[in-house]
């Protein structure tokens, strides 16, 4: 019933173990998930992510295995971490190698690589965060390297004919400039964090907009603008995601997020748009099928 266009199952399994990842996949199967996209962030993570998923699936009953193998898809991409930026050419070469091995006929999930990403621009400075991102470390070389890494991946997506999952945080102008220079406008602006005018720009270029659990705990003073934005995005460009294990929706804020919690984001956004949760599911499922060129799991 629910589609989730962005989660990191490998991060969840690293935190909690394969059995918990298996339980999450089981829950998604029992809930009738239509589409789930496990997102890549490192040049060399695609094959190990697939192998971890295979271990998790092996713990499931036969009927659930079939369901997971139908709804679960993968992306491959390089998040703009400092090390990846500094070694961008080698990283993109490794990414290509991983994609070639993953898509080799006869390999598990060989036809389930449906996107490149996530990659993009991140100028949210958080020295205590996972990446230890500090503005003082970002000299002119790193700024340009980040842009180059993004555009190299956009070129790869264009070459392979796959949608691109854009990570853009506090970097709208650079993101827009890179996309324009690449000439490629197919994919998702994930975990959208800008306003209506920025959304309009991306939409006019052909991009989809994805919202996550962060919408549910928007500050009260900013909620009118958030509601306006959630109503502004047209039906045929709207997608929903968890970004699990991050950004758990209310009432689970501060806890580890999983794709099983996406119902709360659907309920929240459906209410704002004045439609039923079931209708919103239908809309998002259709958009996923069209963007990624897949048949919905329930068909």
Predicted regions and their residues:
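Mid-domain alpha/beta scaffold segments of enzyme catalytic cores
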Residues: 1-299
């Amino acid at each position: 019933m629910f589609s989730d266009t962005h989660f990191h199952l490998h991060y969840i399994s690293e935190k909690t173990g394969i059995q918990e990842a298996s339980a999450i996949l089981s829950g998604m199967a029992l809930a009738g998930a239509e589409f789930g996209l496990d997102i890549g962030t490192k040049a060399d993570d695609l094959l190990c992510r697939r192998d971890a998923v295979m271990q998790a699936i092996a713990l499931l009953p036969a009927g659930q295995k079939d369901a997971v193998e139908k709804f679960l898809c993968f992306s491959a991409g390089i998040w703009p971490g400092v090390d990846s930026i500094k070694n961008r050419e080698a990283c993109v070469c490794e990414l290509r190698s991983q994609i070639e091995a993953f898509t080799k006929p006869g390999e598990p999930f060989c036809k389930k690589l449906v996107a490149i990403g996530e990659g993009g621009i991140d100028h949210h400075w958080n020295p205590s965060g996972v990446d230890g991102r500090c503005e003082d470390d970002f000299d002119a070389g790193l700024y340009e390297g980040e842009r180059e890494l993004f555009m190299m991946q956009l070129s790869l997506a264009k070459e392979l004919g796959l949608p691109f999952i854009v990570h853009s945080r506090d970097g709208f102008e650079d993101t827009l400039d890179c996309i324009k220079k690449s000439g490629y406008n197919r994919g998702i602006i994930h975990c959208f964090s800008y306003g209506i005018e920025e959304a309009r720009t991306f939409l006019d270029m052909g991009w989809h907009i994805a919202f996550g659990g962060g919408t549910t705990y928007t500050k009260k003073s900013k909620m009118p603008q958030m509601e306006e934005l959630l109503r502004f995005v047209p039906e045929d460009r709207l997608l929903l995601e968890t970004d699990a294990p991050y950004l758990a929706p209310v009432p689970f804020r501060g806890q580890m997020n999983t794709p099983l919690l996406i119902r709360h984001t659907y309920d929240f956004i459906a209410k704002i748009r004045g439609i039923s949760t079931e209708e919103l599911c239908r809309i998002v499922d259709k958009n996923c099928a069209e963007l990624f060129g897949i048949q919905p799991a329930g068909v």
